[in-house]
Amino acid sequence: MKYAHAPFVGGHRVSARASILVVLALLAFAFVPTTRAVPPPDADPFYAASVDLGTHPAGAVLRTRSIALYGLPLPVSAWQVQYRTNDANGLPIAGMTTVLAPNWPWFGPGQRPLLSYQIAEDSLGSRCAPSYALRGGWDLGGANTYIDTPFIAEALRRGWAVVTSDYEGPESRFLDGVNAGRAVLDGIRAARALAPDGVGPASPVGGWGYSGGAFATLWAAQMQSEYAPDVQFAGVTAGGIPADWPAMVHGVDGGTQAGLAMLALTAIAKNEPNSGVLELLNERGRSNFAEDVNACGPDFVVKYINAHVDDFAAVPDVLSHPDFRAATDRQELGGGAPVTPMYLYHSTTDNVIPVAGFTDLLGRYCAQGADITSVHSTLPGHNPTAVGEAAGAMGFLADRFAGVPVAPGCHGR
């Protein structure tokens, strides 16, 4: 890829092409299988919730362990942290997060920044959890974690500490915005309580996620002022943003990414048994639901290549059925605007998430007074944009961590 002009980041010219090459080079380290036996979360007592879970405040650290980090070729310390959070119904659940900190001093201003990075978990089973993959649990279900590892590595290389939570929770609730947002915010609280080297109460906090990770990031940002006023973001970046779920699932239905439509349908039926969505499936659909109820996103993609969702439904055009639409409406972003500066980006030719939903979300956020730098990227497609626009996202965060002021209001780039 060629760029006529390199962007300015923090007052310095940065080559976007060079940043892409660095990310791709780091990516090579993330795909070497480990020989260590790592038990999956369901077989690991460390993940089990304690009986006194409800006596702890949200964000409280329940237990920690140092781990050997998998796939990051940098001198860093890493911990798995179990913490108390709340599900969408306000009930206490045991969250799990991975906290990473560089093994060298922070030389920037103030305390070491803390980046909350949300991996696109996109799954229905605990073996798909980022914490399992980052510890070396080699499973196809962790593919998104392995793909996102280079972005985490670049944050660490810059000297930032990173917290990345299993924001779907112990029940692996994909497509549950409130559940995800609370888990992210409480994961940040837990990371600050752990206080890895250089991280303290005054550490600036940032949020970043792409695709499914953007969904969790923005739900957390929307909920922050009400749910966690003590967690104030210096800035948030998000790209490939899931907005307009019906358009998304219709767009991939029948194609190579049809499994994502089946993932969304299965998640709604699993998360909301009273929604009526399960009753919309035919016998074949119910049989597959039973098979897939704990599957990972990559499992769905492989299994349902070129499938049509209506082949598994008892009603025509199930993705437009009022029961399904009502359930997905509850998961749409934009009900409230984050109070932190944001850098939001999306490919105009995104082949997974149509750009129209992104443009509409920008309009809703801006109408509510948000401060946004937006990018309608000309990079082709969903995955290339994740890499190609990473330099701009990280530059925005670096400026916010350095205290560089941002122009108020909404601005396109």
Q: Where in this protein do the model-derived segments appear?
A:
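Catalytic-loop region of hydrolases
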Residues: 36-106
